[in-house]
Regions:
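Carbohydrate-interacting regions of secretory-pathway proteins
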Residues: 26-267
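Bacterial Sec-dependent N-terminal signal peptides
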Residues: 1-27
Length: 267
């Protein structure tokens, strides 16, 4: 019996060390997957129509991803003004100081008010409510194919201090960017950062936010936007369905107990 118990203990120890337990396996370099790839445990779905069954179809799960507008027609309710499937899937938990990572790629389907905002989606954070157009800060995910212009990494928010040289697009302070106050709505990300648009390839996105002190947007490893003196210090996180088929995957977060100086991430 003693030998048997020793063997069992050894096997359990090896099991734990190898990270075979699901909760342990999710963590890597301090990051934890907040979308488990199989269901929406820890999340809730919200669309304009308040149709729970339709929301489940909008946010389909396949192969560990959220596939927005998976089985919808290639042109769904296009430019009707209804926009019933505008919405987000939201975390139940609030977050304050963290690094959020996620990946996305575009599909081929288009929907809703596509002619107005082409290939449009996004990630909202520091959200104070769970409305369709919430109070919070948006990491814009968008590609305007009519101008071949990427908007991923733009801010949609007001009441924050942004940095720009020409008042048009973001520029790092170390490169001449100056504080801009009172700039509401869209704050354009740095131009000419490499991204994948309609080629079926993935983009890697990152939000580094420390309470109401600052936020940094990264796209494919490059800093594309930054702001300080934020209007919110915490909130839930949501990912949008808006005007085009999109895939989200590898949604993970690393939380911090204390504020990490912004300079640590600008090196």
């Amino acid at each position: 019996m003693k030998i048997k118990n020793t063997v069992q203990f050894t096997l359990i120890a090896l099991f734990l060390i190898s990270g075979a337990l699901p909760g342990f396996a999710q963590a890597k370099n301090g990051f934890v997957k907040i979308f488990n790839g199989t269901d929406f445990e820890g999340w809730h779905l919200k669309i304009r129509s308040d149709d729970a069954e339709l929301a489940k179809k909008v946010y389909a799960i396949e192969d560990g991803m959220v596939h927005v507008f998976k089985d919808f027609p290639k042109e769904y309710e296009l430019n009707t003004g209804d926009n019933a499937t505008h919405g987000l899937f939201y975390t139940n938990k609030k977050y304050s100081k963290y690094i959020l990572k996620f990946e996305y790629k575009w599909g081929v389907g288009i929907a809703n008010n596509f002619d107005q905002f082409q290939y449009d989606a996004g990630c909202y954070y520091h959200v104070a409510d769970d409305k369709i157009w919430p109070l919070g800060i948006e990491y814009q995910v968008r590609y305007d194919h009519t101008q071949k212009k990427n908007h991923t990494g733009d801010f949609w928010a007001g009441g924050l201090k942004w940095y720009s040289k020409d008042g048009n697009s973001f520029l790092l302070p170390s490169e001449g960017g100056q504080p801009v106050l009172g700039h509401g709505g869209e704050h354009l990300a740095a131009p000419d950062v490499k991204s994948n648009a309609l080629n079926g390839k993935w983009n890697k996105c990152e939000v580094i936010v420390m309470g109401d002190k600052y936020t940094i947007h990264k796209l494919n490893g490059k800093i594309v936007n930054m702001a300080t003196e934020l209007p919110y210090s915490e909130g839930i996180i949501g990912f949008q369905s808006e005007t085009a088929e999109i895939y989200y995957r590898n949604i993970q977060i690393k939380e911090f107990d204390e504020i990490i100086p912004m300079e640590n991430f600008l090196k």
